[in-house]
C-alpha cells in the first residue's frame, strides 16, 4: 500500500506494462541459461503486435488466442473452463476429447466478462476446443500441456563453458549486456585457446571499433577473413572500421561482401551510400539507399539519406513527401524535421528539441551529415545548437573542412569555457579531441586542462581506463572546478591515496556541497576512518534548511557508519527520524534499519537482557513507512524468528541450524551468540 498511498490519482493501484519480443527480461544470470541477451542488428528496425490478456476472475491462464484467454482445470468428475474474451464473441463452443464431442453450445460473450462452465469428463485424452470454428486449445486433457511445444528451460549440466564455444558465448552475451570489459575478457580467453575463432574475432573487432581503435578493429576483421572471406560480421566490421579510418576503397570492399548476409545487408548498403555521397556520386548513393530500403523499408538511416538526396538533387516534392511520411511515423524524428525545414526555408529546431541535453541531439545529427560529406548541413545544425564547448569544437572543425581556414586561434577560447554539462561520449569525439590537441601543440599554444579532462572522461567511457588516468594525471591541481576532483576520485577509486586527495580538494573548493561530504565520507569508510566520516556528516547535517533529500541521504549514511562502529541504538534513532521517498528497488534503508535492530538485539541477548532484545526483534520485523519500502507479501523473518526462539529456550543448536541456511551477511549478525 505504500505506493498507492502516495499516488496523486484516486483510481487505485496502477499497472506497469512492459513490452518486449523475448521470453523473459534477461538478467545477468541468464548467460548460463538458454535465454541469452539479444543485441540489435545495425540499422535494424523491428515492428510487432502484442496481445494483452486480462485474466480477472478466471483463476489463471492455460492458453490464449487473439480471441480470448482460456483457463482449464479438473475436478474428479468434470472439466471446468473460464474464458475471458478480448472482444465481443458469438459462436459455437465445441469441446472434443479424442475426437469425441463432449460439449456443443452457442454462446455470446462480452469483452472481459468472465464466462465459466463445465462438462462431465473424467478422462485424460487429447482435448480440442474451438469457438466459432477457431481454435482455443489443442492439447493434453489432464496436464493441459500443448504437445510438441516444450522448449528447453535449462542449459545442459555437462555443457563445457570453458570450451572455445562456451567462452565465446559468455563474451558475446556480456557484450549484449553492454558489459564490455567482461566481454573483452571472455572473448580474449576464447582467442587465447584459438586465435582464429572467427565469431570471436568478429565480436572482438566490434568491441575495438566501439573504443575508437579503428586500425586494431580492422586488423582483427581481416584476421577473421583470412579464415573465411565471406564471414558477414567480419566483412561489415572491415567496412565500418575502414570507413572511419579513411580507407574508403577498403570500406567499400568490406561492405560489398557484407551485403550477402541479410543481417548486415541494409547497414552495408547504407555504408556504401554514405561513401558514395562523400565521393560525390549522387546516383550511386541513391541506388544503394534504394537497395537498403528494399531490405529494411522502415530504416530511419536509409529514409534520412533518401530524403536528403531528393532535396540535394532538386526533387523537392519527393523530399517533402519522404520527410512528412517519416514525421507521421515518428513525430520526434528531428532529421526529418530539419530536412522539411530546409525545404520550407525554416530549418529551426530549437522549439522541438527540449530534452535535458539538447546540444547532444545537434551533435548527433551534425555527425551524421558529416559522415555523408554534407558539411554545410552539419555546420547549419551546429550553429542552431545551444552553447557548449563540444558543439563549438565540432563547428570549428566542420568550418575548417569547408573553408580550410586557420582555426587554432579559436580553439583555446572554446576550451577555456566552463565544462558544465560537457559529456563527450562518441568515439568520433576522441579523434576530434586528439586532432585539437595536436593542432594546439603544433601552433605552440598551451593545451587547456579542459581538453585533457574531456579526453579523459571519454577514454573512461570507452573502457580505456589506463589512458584516461594518464589524461587526468596530466592535469594536476590546476582546475578550480570541484566536479573535476569528484570525477577523478571515482576514476582512481582503487588507488585510495589519489582518490582521497581529490575528494579533500573537492571539499576544500566547495565546502557547502553535500556531494563532496557524501563522497568523502564514503571514502573515509572504505579506509576504516568511520569517526572522521561521522564528523564531516554531522557538520553538514547541523546546517539549517537542508533539503529533505540531503537530510535522508546523509542521515542514512550516518546510520550506516554508526552500525559499523557498533552504535546500533543510535543508528536506529537516526533511521526513525528520516523521511525517505520510495523508489523502485530501493530497500537499503529498511535493510539497514533491520540490521541495526537485529545487531542490537543480539548484543542485548549476549548481555542477558532478553525482554529488551525481544522488543528490538519485533521492531526489526516492522516496515516503517518513513523508510520508503513497502512490506512484501511474505517477508523473510527466519532470522528474527530463530532469535526469538533462542531468547526463550536458549537452544544454541537450533539457532545454528537456522543460521547456516541464511546468507553470510545474516550469519555475521549473530556471530557473537554462536561462535
Describe each model-derived feature in a short phrase.
Residues 1-45, 53:
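A contiguous, surface-exposed recognition patch within enzymatic or periplasmic domains that forms
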Residues 163, 172, 197, 206, 231, 240, 265, 274, ...:
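Residue-level recognition of tetratricopeptide repeat
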Residues 61-162, 334-345, 403-432:
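Long, contiguous interaction/recruitment modules in multidomain scaffold/adaptor proteins
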Residues 200, 234, 268, 302, ...:
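TPR alpha-solenoid repeat register
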Residues 193, 227, 261, 295, ...:
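Structural marker of alpha-solenoid helical repeat scaffolds
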Amino acid at each position: 500500500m505504500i505506493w498507492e498511498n502516495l499516488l496523486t490519482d484516486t483510481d487505485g493501484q496502477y499497472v506497469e506494462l512492459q513490452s518486449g519480443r523475448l521470453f523473459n527480461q534477461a538478467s545477468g544470470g541468464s548467460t548460463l541459461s538458454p535465454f541469452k541477451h539479444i543485441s540489435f542488428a545495425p540499422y535494424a528496425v523491428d515492428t510487432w503486435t502484442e496481445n494483452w490478456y486480462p485474466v480477472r476472475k478466471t483463476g489463471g491462464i492455460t492458453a490464449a488466442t487473439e480471441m480470448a484467454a482460456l483457463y482449464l482445470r479438473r475436478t474428479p468428475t468434470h472439466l471446468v473452463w473460464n474464458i475471458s474474451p478480448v472482444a465481443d464473441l458469438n459462436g459455437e463452443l465445441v469441446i472434443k476429447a479424442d475426437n469425441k464431442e463432449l460439449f456443443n453450445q452457442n454462446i455470446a460473450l462480452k469483452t472481459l466478462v468472465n464466462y465459466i462452465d463445465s462438462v462431465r469428463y473424467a478422462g485424460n485424452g487429447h482435448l480440442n476446443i474451438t469457438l466459432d470454428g477457431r481454435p482455443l486449445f489443442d492439447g493434453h486433457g489432464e496436464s493441459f500441456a500443448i504437445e510438441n511445444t516444450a522448449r528447453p528451460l535449462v542449459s545442459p549440466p555437462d555443457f563445457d563453458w570453458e570450451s572455445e564455444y562456451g567462452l565465446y558465448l559468455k563474451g558475446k552475451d556480456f557484450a549484449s549486456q553492454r558489459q564490455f570489459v567482461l566481454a573483452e575478457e571472455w572473448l580474449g580467453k576464447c582467442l587465447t585457446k584459438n586465435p582464429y575463432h572467427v565469431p570471436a574475432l568478429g565480436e572482438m573487432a566490434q568491441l575495438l571499433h566501439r573504443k575508437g581503435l579503428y586500425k586494431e578493429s580492422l586488423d582483427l576483421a581481416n584476421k577473421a577473413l583470412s579464415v573465411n572471406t565471406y564471414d558477414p560480421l567480419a566483412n561489415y566490421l572491415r567496412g565500418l572500421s575502414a570507413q572511419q579510418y579513411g580507407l574508403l576503397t577498403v570500406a567499400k570492399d568490406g561492405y560489398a561482401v557484407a551485403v550477402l548476409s541479410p543481417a548486415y545487408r541494409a547497414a552495408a548498403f547504407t555504408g556504401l551510400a554514405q561513401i558514395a555521397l562523400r565521393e560525390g556520386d549522387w546516383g550511386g548513393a541513391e541506388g544503394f539507399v534504394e537497395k537498403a530500403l528494399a531490405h529494411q523499408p522502415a530504416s530511419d538511416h536509409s529514409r534520412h539519406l533518401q530524403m536528403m538526396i531528393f532535396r540535394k538533387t532538386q526533387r523537392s516534392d519527393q523530399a517533402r513527401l519522404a520527410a512528412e511520411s517519416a514525421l507521421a511515423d515518428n513525430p520526434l524524428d528531428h532529421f526529418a524535421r530539419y530536412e522539411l525545414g530546409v525545404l520550407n526555408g525554416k530549418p529551426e529546431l530549437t522549439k522541438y528539441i527540449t530534452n535535458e541535453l539538447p546540444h547532444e541531439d545537434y551533435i548527433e545529427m551534425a555527425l551524421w551529415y558529416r559522415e555523408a560529406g554534407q558539411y554545410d548541413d552539419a555546420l547549419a545544425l551546429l550553429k542552431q545548437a545551444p552553447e557548449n564547448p563540444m558543439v563549438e569544437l565540432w563547428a570549428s572543425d566542420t568550418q575548417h573542412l569547408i573553408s580550410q581556414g586557420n582555426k587554432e586561434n579559436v580553439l583555446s577560447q572554446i576550451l577555456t569555457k566552463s565544462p558544465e554539462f560537457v559529456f563527450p561520449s562518441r568515439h568520433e569525439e576522441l579523434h576530434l579531441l586528439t586532432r585539437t590537441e595536436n593542432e594546439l601543440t603544433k601552433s605552440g599554444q598551451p593545451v587547456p586542462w579542459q581538453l585533457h579532462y574531456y579526453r579523459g572522461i571519454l577514454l573512461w567511457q570507452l573502457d580505456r581506463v589506463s589512458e584516461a588516468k594518464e589524461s587526468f594525471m596530466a592535469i594536476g591541481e590546476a582546475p578550480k572546478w570541484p566536479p573535476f576532483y569528484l570525477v577523478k576520485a571515482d576514476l582512481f577509486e582503487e588507488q585510495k591515496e589519489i582518490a582521497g586527495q581529490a575528494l579533500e580538494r573537492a571539499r576544500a573548493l566547495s565546502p557547502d556541497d553535500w556531494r563532496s561530504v557524501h563522497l568523502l565520507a564514503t571514502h573515509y569508510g572504505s579506509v576504516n576512518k568511520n569517526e572522521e566520516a561521522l564528523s564531516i556528516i554531522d557538520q553538514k547535517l547541523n546546517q539549517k534548511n537542508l533539503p529533505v533529500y540531503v537530510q535522508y541521504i546523509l542521515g542514512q549514511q550516518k546510520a550506516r557508519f554508526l552500525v559499523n562502529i557498533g552504535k546500533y541504538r543510535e543508528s536506529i534513532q537516526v533511521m526513525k527520524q528520516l523521511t525517505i521517498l520510495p523508489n523502485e528497488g530501493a530497500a537499503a534503508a529498511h535493510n539497514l534499519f533491520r540490521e541495526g535492530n537485529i545487531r542490537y538485539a543480539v548484543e542485548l541477548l549476549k548481555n542477558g537482557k532478553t525482554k529488551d532484545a525481544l522488543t528490538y526483534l519485533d521492531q526489526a520485523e516492522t516496515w516503517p513507512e518513513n523508510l520508503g519500502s513497502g512490506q512484501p507479501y511474505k517477508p523473510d523473518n527466519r532470522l528474527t524468528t530463530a532469535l526469538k526462539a533462542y531468547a526463550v529456550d536458549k537452544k544454541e543448536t537450533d539457532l545454528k541450524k537456522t543460521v547456516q541456511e541464511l546468507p553470510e551477511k545474516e550469519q555475521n549478525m549473530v556471530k557473537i551468540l554462536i561462535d
